[in-house]
Amino acid sequence: MTSTQEQGPDIVSAPLRDAATVVLVRDAADGIEVFLQRRVKQMAFAGGMTVFPGGGVDKRDADADLAWTGPEATWWAGQFGSDAEIAQALVCAAVRETFEECGVLLATDADGAFADPEGLAEDRQRLVEKSLSFAQFLTARGLTLRADLLRPLAHWITPVNEKRRYDTRFFLAAMPDGQHADAETTEAEVARWVNARVAIDSWAAGQHFLMPPTWSQLNYVSQFSTIDELLDAERVIEPILPNVTPGAGLAGLGFPGSDEYFRTLGDQQPPEITL
């Protein structure tokens, strides 16, 4: 594990929940753009923060009864240090959450064509309401999950002092041709495509707020000129569990790159500002 966790005597760790986050990217004239959302302030976790689409694993995401193209669950398990069942659930959660939160569906029909998300609005809402499982949705629509369109990116674990804790695997995915990322989710106030470096610079200027995991992924993406270079890059995924200095708040977190993060952050605190 990249960071060793320090616990104070009064810290009682909340249970971890598996989660998946997708860094959706596209090429643009000025470099790689990422799809970002600003979560509504009322959200119990990361309210008001700028984030990527993603969320917790639904236990039904582990349902193996679905069509799947790309690396098998055992390969993903090796990348993320989990068992195959959890790995499959993480991949399914990544694709499901991306569809639920921004309408982008990484699944194709029998002819290899991407489904039209606009014609699946009712299914999308049922997935959000959890009245339909992702496997049921794909099977009913004759769709195949495209695990080959995803790449493993990172693995962050919420510090032990947080009330809600997630064991989050980050995925990369290129925006499919012919699809449109929208803001039709109750979890976000604003959603838009932003150049990765611009997103960091605007955070440094106090225009929005990035949590360390989000900042870290943007910082990584900004080092590449094209999506092909980014997707083809070799990565070794190591879990990152930030150190905690009890009573020190955000400034008490230690993680890879934390010196740069806090130097750029300066005196900012999570603000009520715009993306």
Give names to the regions the model predicted.
Residues 1-275:
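N-terminal leader/linker segments that precede catalytic domains of diphosphate-processing enzymes
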